[in-house]
Regions:
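A compositional/biophysical signature of low hydrophobicity enriched in polar/charged and small residues
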Residues: 1-88
Length: 88
């Protein structure tokens, strides 16, 4: 089972670029976005199971210097991916 997740990340002020670049180097991370609004960075990821997602968050993301908080949203269903509609 593949688990897709969107991770919402709060970063120490002035450190968004450093954190974004560090996250972009992680092979488990698919996309990294710097945002306006509530969160500083959002990343998308795909893991083989929830245990691997948990490990990614606790053992890698939370250890990146200047990451303050990670909030996770697990994708339940995808309606459109890469500009293609998905109907299952």
């Amino acid at each position: 089972m593949t688990v897709r997740a969107i991770l919402h990340i709060f970063v120490e002020p002035g450190k968004i670029e450093d954190v974004g670049e560090a996250l972009a180097k992680m092979p488990e991370i698919i996309d990294v976005y710097e945002l306006t609004g509530e969160y500083d960075i959002i990343v998308t990821t795909r893991t083989n199971d929830l245990h691997k997602l948990r490990s990614l968050i606790s053992e890698k993301l939370m250890r990146v210097h200047d990451v303050k908080v990670v909030t996770t949203s697990v994708v339940l269903h995808t309606y459109k991916l890469n500009s293609k509609e998905i109907f299952e």
